[in-house]
Amino acid sequence: MAVFYRRNIDCAALPRHAAAISVPSARRYNPVMSAITLAPHNYAEVIALLEAREWAVCCLCAAWCDVCTEFRSGFDRLALQHPDKVMLWIDIEDRADLVDEFDVENFPTLLIQHGDDMIFYGTVEADEKSLNRLILGRTRDQPTLRSATTTHRLREKLGRLSDGEI
């Protein structure tokens, strides 16, 4: 059973010094890739991808969580099925500076965003087929299925982290 949480989160703290870093154009990135493990060294790459793609799907996990460890390969396969989305693997302990506003109680927890709009946030089963259906269902172009109640400015927050503002 999934538990759903909704919070108003400022997710716009992506490192802004990333603009000064030589980053390959997001168009040059391989459009079919596995999920990206979010880390300070790749904030600029993630910012570029978030600017190039409308959707972000983030799996919030922990390195010590056996369920998360077992699910990682499934999440990577999901990334291959959704090349139009930025698929991020975020360790909530390593990246607490980015996700500290989230109340993650169980793993894995999934966050789906369209731009800055949080479309889905909640604990999910670590089942590839179920998550694929959830992602497809929440990312359709039907506004009634995508009504967001909160925002999370991931790019902006990564920029602030990169600039040392947080």
Question: Predicted segments — roles?
Answer:
Residues H17-V32:
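Short, Lys/Arg-enriched N-terminal segments with co-localized hydrophobic residues
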Residues Y29-I47:
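N-terminal "domain-start" segment that seeds a small globular fold
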Residues I47-R77:
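Local sequence-structure signature of Cys/Sec-based thiol-disulfide redox active-site neighborhoods
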Residues L60, P83-D97:
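Thiol-based oxidoreductase modules, predominantly thioredoxin-like and allied folds used
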Residues F102-L111, E128:
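Structural micro-motif
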Residues Q113-A148:
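Non-catalytic, surface beta->alpha helical segment in thiol-disulfide oxidoreductase systems
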Residues D141-I166:
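Acidic/histidine-enriched, glycine/proline-rich intrinsically disordered or flexible terminal extensions
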